């Protein structure tokens, strides 16, 4: 299995996001809300939604890079065949400057492992 994050593994279309928001199931912890829905494919796709309230663009982009990296490196433990949308919560925004990559990694990976169809 390759560790790249290919174009086909990205959620890009508005209708895909809307379908997940409407019909998807959710999991959450203090840092993230994860929405997911079966996609009928043999691989999972990732979408990230970060509101402007989270902070300035550099901060939002840093979080998105972290989430993509966690997804990319953890493909082996994330169930296949799901569309996944990750949304950060307010607590992560408030603590973002004090939190390191590995704390975010642990919190997000715990949620992603719980995805089941």
Swiss-Prot record:
GO molecular function: 3'-tRNA processing endoribonuclease activity; ribonuclease P activity; tRNA binding
Keywords for the protein's UniProt record, in alphabetical order: Endonuclease, Hydrolase, Nuclease, RNA-binding, tRNA processing
Gene3D superfamilies assigned: 3.30.230.10
Domain of life: Bacteria
PROSITE patterns in alphabetical order: RIBONUCLEASE_P
GO biological process: tRNA 5'-leader removal
SUPFAM superfamilies recorded: Ribosomal protein S5 domain 2-like
GO terms under cellular component: ribonuclease P complex
Pfam families the UniProt entry points to: Ribonuclease_P
InterPro entries attached to this UniProt entry: Ribosomal_Su5_D2-typ_SF (IPR020568), Ribsml_uS5_D2-typ_fold_subgr (IPR014721), RNase_P (IPR000100), RNase_P_CS (IPR020539)
EC number of the protein: 3.1.26.5
Top EC class, one word: hydrolase
Known catalytic reactions: Endonucleolytic cleavage of RNA, removing 5'-extranucleotides from tRNA precursor
Family statement drawn from the similarity comment of this UniProt entry: Belongs to the RnpA family.
Assembly and binders: Consists of a catalytic RNA component (M1 or rnpB) and a protein subunit.
NCBIfam families with a match to the protein in the record: rnpA (TIGR00188)
Function: RNaseP catalyzes the removal of the 5'-leader sequence from pre-tRNA to produce the mature 5'-terminus. It can also cleave other RNA substrates such as 4.5S RNA. The protein component plays an auxiliary but essential role in vivo by binding to the 5'-leader sequence and broadening the substrate specificity of the ribozyme.
Protein name: Ribonuclease P protein component
Species assigned in the record: Thermotoga petrophila (strain ATCC BAA-488 / DSM 13995 / JCM 10881 / RKU-1)
